[in-house]
């Protein structure tokens, strides 16, 4: 059933009542836009923008943005339970991106048109290596995007803007052996 049939949360904007299920939790300041969906046992822990889908067992932090058609999915276990997943504060999931069975920390970016699962191979450009996405599960400050010339999604540590001496420049080079043929 719809959440708003039973309770109307204060300080929350819901564009389409049918898109928020009873049992969802929405913190004050949250916006669920027309294409957004929040299932039962899912929600926001601070003001957030949801234009994608939060499935059961998923929470997002303050300032998180789920852009159009993005999803965070916690698949059901054989006993029917869903492991809890969390997307950190100020994390952005790009248009048509999906994060399955993996948590992300604060200040992360998942670029558009990506499907990231724990066993998805990522290219870590900063140290020129391949590794599964599970190696950064729950960590803060990652950008994962498609980059021209790379087969795998490219993961880069986001520059810490709070520390002094950071040049703010990113290393956009890629190994020639990793380039798409």
Locate the predicted segments by residue:
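A mid-sequence, solvent-exposed acidic-amphipathic segment
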Residues: 4-7, 17-19
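A generic structural signal for short, non-catalytic loop/turn and secondary-structure boundary residues
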Residues: 7, 65, 137-139
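C-terminal segments of enzyme domains that contribute to small-molecule binding surfaces
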Residues: 79-84, 89-92, 98, 115-181
């Amino acid at each position: 059933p719809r959440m708003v049939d039973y309770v109307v949360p204060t300080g929350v904007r819901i564009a389409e009542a049918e898109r928020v299920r009873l049992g969802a939790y929405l913190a004050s300041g949250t916006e669920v836009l027309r294409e957004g969906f929040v299932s039962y046992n899912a929600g926001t822990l601070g003001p957030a923008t949801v234009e994608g889908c939060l499935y059961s067992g998923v929470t997002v932090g303050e300032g998180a943005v789920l852009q159009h058609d993005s999803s965070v999915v916690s698949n059901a276990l054989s006993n029917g339970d869903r492991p809890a997943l969390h997307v950190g504060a100020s994390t952005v999931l790009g248009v048509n991106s999906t994060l399955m069975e993996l948590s992300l920390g604060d200040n992360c970016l998942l670029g558009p048109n990506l499907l990231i699962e724990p066993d998805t191979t990522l290219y870590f450009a900063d140290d020129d290596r391949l590794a599964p996405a599970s190696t950064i599960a729950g960590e803060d400050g990652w950008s994962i995007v498609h980059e021209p010339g790379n087969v795998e999604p490219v993961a880069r540590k986001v520059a810490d803007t709070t520390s002094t001496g950071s040049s703010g420049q990113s290393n956009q080079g890629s190994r020639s052996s990793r380039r798409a043929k």
